[in-house]
């Protein structure tokens, strides 16, 4: 039986469903992952090195896997990605040494390399094939809101699981990992059912020759980024943001654990905190169309990045858990608004669908590279000085990228001024 034809609205709905299912398992992990690793005996510096294992894998694989998605299809690559995440989650349940935890994060690095880009690229290309004027910024704004809700639900559920400890004999911090494992399996089923894509592998060439195209696709994408001031500015901004993000994702939970002097209690607090943060992030994403109607996307992106850096400095200066929690929620709300702006500028700057996933991967690569560098350097700085000094340093690095959005926004506006 031939399935009914897709419309722009149905593609958007599928995109949003798949986006929510992609991030729901992550919501279960965010409140516990740092605390679980620290509970198993690692120092902040060792935590940074374990995170760096993920960054190293991304550094090696991000561009080739983006090219792979452009060559063999986005759906295939997403399914392979989910397999690596399932393996990582399974190992995380029992991993209790730095080498095993490094393997866990390396597997997640493979997952993130494969996963970054294909879904967005599938949506943009499918929607534009149906309607060249499809409003992709509105879809990315809605995607940010859905992501916030999914992460919020996952964080609340993880907090409840840790607080109630329903499985006797299993560490309370491990139970959300089990839930994430089940939900990732649901995500796989949804990708199979909802992501309709024409095969990019021609019958007369086959998979081997399709894969052989990957190096040429990667080289072409890199040339495109180098030749475009918009794309170059955006990927550099992403690198600086990735370094600064370490202060939010890795160092803020560690600071909260120190202030509360109890990792389990910190995990219980982080659950509802993350829930609120991700809901606020979703709200931030939802107001992006209003912001960009009043000011240029480049200007909005610059101011949001500066505001986010300011809130991270506030986290460093905060002395109590309530202030840390409030500023963390505000930081995530600003991030929820800034990401759709960045993604909209990025996709508008990509002219060829043939290299879209690869260029999106290049952007993701710089962010992951930044996070890897931040994990090592800021982790070492925290061990050598203090958590607060490391958090402030991350915020300052994040702020340096703000003017680059003005470059991206200005160059985007120039062609229309001459029409």
For each feature predicted by the language model, list its residue ranges:
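Helix-loop junctions on the cytosolic side of multi-pass membrane transporters
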Residues: 180-209, 407-417
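C-terminal transmembrane bundle of multi-pass solute transporters/carriers
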Residues: 3, 50, 54, 59-67, ...
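Symmetry-related core transmembrane helices of the 12-TM Major Facilitator Superfamily/SLC fold
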Residues: 171-193, 391-407
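Helix-loop boundary and gating motifs at the non-cytosolic
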Residues: 2-60, 93, 229-278
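Cytoplasmic helix-loop-helix junction between adjacent transmembrane helices
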Residues: 106-148
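Transmembrane alpha-helix termini and helix-breaking/packing motifs in multi-pass membrane transporters
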Residues: 35, 39, 92, 151-177, ...
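Conserved MFS/SLC helix-loop-helix module at the cytosolic interface between two early adjacent transmembrane helices
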Residues: 58-97
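Juxtamembrane intracellular "pre-TM" segments in multi-pass secondary transporters
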Residues: 1-12, 194-234
């Amino acid at each position: 039986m031939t399935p009914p034809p897709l419309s722009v609205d149905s593609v958007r709905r599928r995109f949003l469903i798949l986006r929510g299912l992609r991030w729901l398992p992550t919501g279960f992990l965010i409140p516990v992952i740092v605390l679980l690793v620290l509970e198993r005996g690692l120092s902040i510096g060792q935590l940074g090195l374990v995170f760096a294992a993920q960054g190293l894998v991304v550094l090696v694989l991000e561009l080739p896997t983006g090219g792979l998605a452009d060559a063999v299809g986005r759906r295939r690559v997403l399914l392979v990605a989910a397999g690596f995440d399932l393996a990582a989650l399974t190992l995380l349940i029992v991993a209790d040494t730095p080498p095993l935890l490094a393997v866990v994060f390396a597997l997640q690095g493979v997952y993130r390399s494969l996963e970054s880009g294909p879904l967005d690229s599938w949506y943009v290309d499918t929607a534009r094939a149906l309607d060249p004027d499809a409003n992709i910024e509105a879809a990315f704004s809605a995607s940010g809101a859905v992501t916030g809700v999914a992460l919020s639900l996952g964080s609340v559920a993880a907090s409840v699981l840790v607080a109630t400890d329903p499985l006797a004999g299993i560490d309370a911090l491990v139970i959300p990992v089990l839930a994430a494992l089940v939900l990732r399996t649901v995500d796989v089923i949804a990708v199979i059912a909802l992501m309709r894509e024409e095969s990019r592998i021609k019958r007369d060439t086959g998979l081997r020759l399709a894969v052989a195209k990957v190096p040429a696709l990667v080289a072409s994408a890199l040339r495109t980024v180098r030749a475009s001031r918009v794309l170059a500015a955006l990927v550099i901004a992403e690198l600086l943001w990735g370094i600064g993000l370490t202060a939010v994702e890795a160092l803020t939970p560690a600071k909260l654990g120190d202030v509360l002097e109890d990792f389990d209690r910190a995990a219980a607090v982080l659950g509802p905190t993350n829930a609120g943060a991700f809901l606020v992030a979703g709200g931030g994403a939802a107001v992006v169309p209003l912001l960009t109607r009043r000011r240029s996307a480049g200007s909005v992106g610059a101011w949001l990045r500066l505001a986010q850096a300011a809130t991270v400095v506030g986290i460093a200066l905060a002395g109590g858990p309530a202030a840390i929690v409030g500023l963390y929620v505000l930081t995530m709300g600003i991030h929820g608004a800034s990401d759709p702006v960045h993604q909209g500028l990025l996709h508008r700057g990509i002219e060829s669908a043939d290299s879209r996933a690869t260029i999106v991967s290049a952007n993701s690569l710089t962010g992951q590279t930044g996070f890897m560098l931040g994990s090592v350097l800021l982790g070492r700085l925290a061990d050598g000085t203090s958590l607060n000094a490391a958090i402030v340093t991350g915020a300052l690095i994040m702020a340096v990228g703000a003017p680059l959005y003005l470059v991206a926004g200005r160059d985007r506006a120039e062609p229309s001024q001459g029409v």
